[in-house]
């Protein structure tokens, strides 16, 4: 039986990973950003995608890629809001709560925990998205980084997308749509991962064990 972490609003960010990494994110605001090239060549099917970095798709295949993929630094998180509903595969149950006269949706994050060994899957749940975004932008300004903002990922079907469509780092194949990503994009002219520190997030986030706790959204979110 999973414990419940109840969220009163339908706008959250979630980062899943190993416990020590998630504690660094919560306590120090450590944002670890890998490059598009890292994601393009990673063999873990939950993380890597050979179509990352694609600029154009023709007949379902990558016909052209962007340059300097090592310079594109990405921070990716799972997200939900009132516009982007939760993927059906992640919904454990939906029920009506008479006492609060609202809908309760239980989300099972174990379906996303293949990012790390199952017993080590922890999640940082960010409840104040606007404040997180403000701190992220501020950290970029302090470090004089070329920040291109954050966007919800647009998922595409490689068999149907037009050859004329120019893809950006905010596009991804629809076979990954359950990840419901929002991406933060920085350009930095070196090949190393980028570490950015936002400061403690304890006032706007919490950490949970994915294998012990389900997310419960109290209110309409579909």
PLM region descriptions:
Residues 1-222:
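NAD-dependent ADP-ribosyltransferases
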């Amino acid at each position: 039986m999973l414990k419940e972490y109840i969220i009163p609003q339908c706008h959250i960010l979630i980062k899943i990973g190993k416990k020590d990494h998630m504690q660094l994110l919560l306590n120090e605001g450590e944002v670890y950003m890998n490059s598009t090239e890292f994601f393009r060549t990673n063999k873990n099917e939950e993380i890597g995608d050979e179509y990352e970095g694609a600029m154009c798709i023709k007949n379902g295949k990558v016909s052209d890629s962007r340059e300097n993929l090592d310079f594109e630094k990405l921070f990716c998180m799972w997200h939900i809001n009132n516009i982007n509903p939760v993927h059906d595969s992640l919904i454990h149950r939906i029920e009506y709560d008479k006492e609060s006269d609202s809908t309760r949706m239980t989300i099972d994050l174990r379906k996303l925990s293949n990012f790390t060994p199952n017993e080590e899957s922890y999640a940082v749940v960010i409840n104040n998205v606007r404040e997180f975004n403000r701190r992220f932008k501020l950290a970029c300004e302090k470090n004089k980084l070329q920040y291109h903002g954050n966007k919800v990922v647009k998922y595409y079907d490689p068999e149907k997308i037009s050859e004329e469509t120019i893809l950006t780092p905010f596009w991804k194949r629809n076979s990954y749509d359950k990840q419901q990503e929002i991406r933060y994009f920085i350009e930095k002219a070196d090949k190393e991962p980028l570490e950015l520190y936002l400061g403690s997030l304890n006032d706007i986030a919490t950490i949970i064990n994915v294998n012990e706790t389900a997310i419960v959204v109290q209110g309409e979110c579909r």
